Amino acid sequence: MALFVRLLALALALALGPAATLAGPAKSPYQLVLQHSRLRRQQHGPNVCAVQKVIGTNRKYFTNCKQWYQRKICGKSTVISYECCPGYEKVPGERSCPAALPLANLYETLGVVGSTTTQLYTDRTEKLRPEMEGPGRFTIFAPSNEAWASLPAEVLDSLVSNVNIELLNALRYHMVDRRVLTDELKHGMALTSMYQNSKFQIHHYPNGIVTVNCARLLKADHHATNGVVHLIDKVISTVTNNIQQIIEIEDTFETLRAAVAASGLNTLLESDGQFTLLAPTNEAKEKIPTETLNRILGDPEALRDLLNNHILKSAMCAEAIVAGLSMETLEATTLEVGCSGDMLTINGKAIISNKDVLATNGVIHFIDELLIPDSAKTLSELAAGSDVSTAIDLFGQAGLGTHLSGNERLTLLAPLNSVFEEGAPPIDAHTRNLLRNHIIKDQLASKYLYHGQTLDTLGGKKLRVFVYRNSLCIENSCIAAHDKRGRYGTLFTMDRMLTPPSGTVMDVLKGDNRFSMLVAAIQFRRLTETLNREGAYTVFAPTNEAFQALPPGELNKLLGNAKELADILKYHVGEEILVSGGIGTLVRLKSLQGDKLEVSSKNNAVSVNKEPVAESDIMATNGVVYAITSVLQPPANRPQERGDELADSALEIFKQASAFSRASQRSVRLAPVYQRLLERMKH
C-alpha cells in the first residue's frame, strides 16, 4: 500500500510537471526520473536505483514509466539492472546500498565516477591537479573513459602534444568556478566555463535527460569536498559560430545558403535563441523534381514556409531522443523526431546524415531530404501518394490537371480511393462536368465552414454545407480526413462522390418512375407547393411497391380518410436536411406531422423506424430524398370516416398515377393489389 501511495504521488508530480508539485519546491525532470527509478527498486532495499541498459551496448538510462513498461530505448530492447543511486555505495554482506559515499576532493571523485582518463590527463598538466585537490567550489563535467577513447586520433594527438595549453584549455572548458547541481541546470541556459569565460549550453529535457553541449549526463550530482562532478558521454569543445555562420562556411549547404539569403531568414539564424535547424544538404535537392524546386525557389512565400518547416522552436540534441517526440516548427507544423538504434529519424525516416553540430544559438542536424510543408505545395502535390490518388488521376484524364497545379485559389473535393473499388467512371461529358463540380472556386478551411453555407463550383453549381454533431458534409459527401491547405489550394478528402442537386424535392419525385403513386398522393393533398418551395426537407419516399405491399384493407382505409392520408404524407417529411453521413448511430428527426422519425445507420446501411432504406441521398435543391420500400405509420394514427368528396378525389389522383405508370411501364403489368384498387375506384 505504501508503495502504491508513493507511485501515485509520483504520477501526480509528473502530471503537474516541473512547474508545481503537491508539496515543497518543484522537482526537475531529472529528479523526477531518478525518483521513479528509486521507487522501482523497493524490493532491493534503500538507495538502489533501477536502470535500463540497452542490450549490446553500455548505454544506461534512468527512465520514466512509459519507457519502463515498453522496455525499449530507440527501438532497441533493454534489460533492467539495479545499481547504487548517486552518492551511495554497497557494504560487504549488506543488501542494497546503505552507505553514503565518503566525500573526497574533485580529483579523487573523478575516479569514483569512472573518469580515470580525465584524472590521467589532469596529471599531465602542471596547474589543474592542485586546483582540483585544493580549496574551492568547482563543478566539472567530466568525460567518461569511453568518451576520451572515441575522440579522433588527430584531435587527441593535438591535445596531448601541448598539455599545458591545448589540453589544459580543453579541461578548463569542462569546468565552472562554482558548485552547480542538476536542479539548477535549466533548459536553454548557458554556463560560463573556466576557459576564457567561454560558454556552453545546458538543455534539461522533460524526459529527465540533461545535456551539456549535447553531451548527456551519465552520472550526476556527485558531491566533492570542493565541488561537484557530473559524468558526461562526450568530450565537449568550444562553440563560436551561430547557425548562419555555419551555413556560410559549409560547402554542402550551397543551395540552402542561397535559399536562406533569398528568404531573408539569415537575420533570424544569426539572432540569439535556441533553435534546431534540420539543414538540407546539396544532395537533398536532387530528390525532388526540378520543376517543384524551381517553383518554390521562385515563390518568396512558399520558400519561407519551406525553410521555416526545417527549424524547430527549441534546441534538440540527439542524445535527448529515446523515443518518438512531436516537435513544433516555425511553420507551426509538427515533425516527429525519433530514433532507431543510433540513427536519428524524422517522421520515421533515417534521413539525418550528421547530427549535433553545435552553434551558439542552437544545434544543426544535416538531412538529405527536403521537408516540404503542405503550405508550399500545389493541390496535385498535396494529393501525391495519398488516399485520393484515383480521384486525382480522374481529374487529370478529364483535362482539369492545370487547376491542380496552378495558382488559382481553389478547394478540391477528392473522394477516397475506396469509393472507386468497383471501378472508376468513364471520362465523358457527364463525368467531366461532375468532376468540375468537385472544385470550389475559393480556398477554404473546413473549420470556417458553417451550416447552410453555399459554395460555388467550377461547374457552375452551388453546393450546400451541412454541419452535424460528428460530421461535416458538402451535399451528400462528408469530409473523411483533416483538410490539407496548400500554397493556393486546399484538399478536402471526401467519403463519396458528390451529387449536386438538380431540381426541388418535387422535381426529384416526379422524375423517378418509382414514386408515381406518392406524387399522385402529394398532389391530391396539395403538398406540391410545400415540396417545391425553398426549404430544408428530408423525404422518406415510399416507392410504388411500398404502396402495393400494403394489405388491401389498409390501402382502402388510407384512401378513405383525408386527414390520415395527409398525416402519413407529412410524417414522411423531416423538417431539416439529413444526409446519410450525418446520421451517426441514431437521430430523431421531427416530421412535418409533428412526431419524430428514428433514423439510424449501421455499417453504411440506413434505416428509418427500423425499416431499411433502399437508396439514400438523392439530393434536391430544397432537401434530400431517401427511397424506402414500406409506408411509415405515425405512432398515434387515428383513422376517421371517409367522405364522398374524398372518394371522387382519390379516384382522380390514382387515375393520374395509373396513367403515369402506363406511360413509363407499358410492358409491365401492374401489381394485383394496384389493379384491383383502380378497378374498384372506377365504380
Curated annotation (Swiss-Prot):
Domain spans labelled FAS1: 103-236, 240-371, 375-498, 502-632
Residues carrying Phosphoserine: S37
Keywords of the record: Cell adhesion, Disulfide bond, Extracellular matrix, Gamma-carboxyglutamic acid, Phosphoprotein, Repeat, Secreted, Signal
Extent of the signal sequence: 1-23
GO molecular function: cell adhesion molecule binding
GO process terms (BP): cell adhesion; extracellular matrix organization
Localisation per UniProt entry: Secreted; Secreted, Extracellular space, Extracellular matrix
GO cellular component, one term: extracellular matrix
Keyword Ribonucleoprotein among record annotations: no
Organs and tissues of expression: Located primarily in the epithelium of normal adult cornea, in fetal stromal cells, and both endothelium- and stroma-derived cells in healing corneal wounds. Not expressed in normal adult endothelium and stroma.
The keyword Signal appears for this protein: yes
Coiled-coil stretches: none
Primary site of residence: secreted
PROSITE patterns, sorted: EMI (PS51041), FAS1 (PS50213)
Modified residues (S-cysteinyl cysteine): C65
Pfam families, per database record: Fasciclin
Motif (Cell attachment site): 642-644
Domain EMI: 45-99
Post-translational modification: Gamma-carboxylation is controversial. Gamma-carboxyglutamated; gamma-carboxyglutamate residues are formed by vitamin K dependent carboxylation; this may be required for calcium binding. According to a more recent report, does not contain vitamin K-dependent gamma-carboxyglutamate residues.
Highest taxon of the lineage: Eukaryota
Biological function: Plays a role in cell adhesion. May play a role in cell-collagen interactions.
Oligomer and partners: Binds to type I, II, and IV collagens.
Protein name stated in the entry: Transforming growth factor-beta-induced protein ig-h3
Gene behind the chain: TGFBI
